């Protein structure tokens, strides 16, 4: 029997490198909105295609933007 061929996942393009963005700022709401879901949750790295370091910076920037009411907190709550 022939060995099954292993499929490799297609590498995702990094949206920050494609747009030539080096600085992630909490005041750049348009950029940060690309990394949060319609419910306001931070999207996972495997979904967005960013590096570990970039994901940390994005998460921190989103949290800072939420603190100063530029972005909503996740979920609408009950009722």
UniProtKB/Swiss-Prot annotation:
Give the superkingdom in one word: Bacteria
- Spans through the membrane: none
Coiled coil region boundaries: none
Q: Which InterPro entries match?
A: Ribosomal_bS18, Ribosomal_bS18_CS, Ribosomal_bS18_sf
Q: May I have one GO cellular component term?
A: cytosolic small ribosomal subunit
GO MF, one example: small ribosomal subunit rRNA binding
UniProt record, GO biological process: translation
User: Which family, according to UniProt?
Assistant: Belongs to the bacterial ribosomal protein bS18 family.
This molecule's function is given as: Binds as a heterodimer with protein bS6 to the central domain of the 16S rRNA, where it helps stabilize the platform of the 30S subunit.
Q: Tell me what this protein is called.
A: Small ribosomal subunit protein bS18
Native source species: Renibacterium salmoninarum (strain ATCC 33209 / DSM 20767 / JCM 11484 / NBRC 15589 / NCIMB 2235)
Task: Supply the gene name.
Answer: rpsR
């Amino acid at each position: 029997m022939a060995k099954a061929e292993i499929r490799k996942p297609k590498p995702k393009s990094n949206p920050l490198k494609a747009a030539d963005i080096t600085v992630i700022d909490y005041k750049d709401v348009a950029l940060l909105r690309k990394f949060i879901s319609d419910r306001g949750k931070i999207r996972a790295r495997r979904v967005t295609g960013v590096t570990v370091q970039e994901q940390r910076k994005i998460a921190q920037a989103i949290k800072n933007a939420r603190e100063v009411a530029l972005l909503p907190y996740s979920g609408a709550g009950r009722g």
